[in-house]
Amino acid sequence: MSVFGRMAGVALLGFGLVVAGSAMAGDAVKGEKVFKKCKACHYVDKEKNKTGPHLVAVLGREAGSLEGYKYSKAMKASGLVWDEETLAAYLKAPKKYVKGTKMAFAGLKKDKDVADVIAYLKAAN
């Protein structure tokens, strides 16, 4: 293969990686719409608990650590810190990710919805 052919291949590979990466980048506006499912139990804009804990500044927070909310023993003992990766896994299947969690929601089925909700949580805080 010629040098030009290899350079073109590398350029196409790089372009493909950029496109794939941006496909999973979340959209905060769409995430706000998806978050409507969560609003029944969680606030994102005020430090007040509902059925679930508030999600103000949730990224970087140790799971089960918010004062004033009664977490499950499983959540308190999980040792998780909420970052994009742990939050994504939890939002997809809460009861599988933290067995014994009190969260009744079954999870978000679409990876794009998960990414959008995380983008919304980041933008809201």
Locate each region found by the language model.
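Bacterial N-terminal signal peptides
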Residues: 9-19
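Bacterial N-terminal signal peptides that target proteins for export
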Residues: 1-11
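Sec/Tat signal peptide C-region and signal peptidase I cleavage site
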Residues: 19-27
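Periplasmic/extracellular electron-transfer cofactor-ligation site
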Residues: 26-81, 88-101, 123-125
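Juxtamembrane/interfacial segments around transmembrane helices
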Residues: 1, 84-86
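Short, exposed beta-strand-loop hairpins at the edges of beta-sheets
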Residues: 106-125
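A general structural signal for short secondary-structure boundary/capping elements
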Residues: 85, 100-106, 119
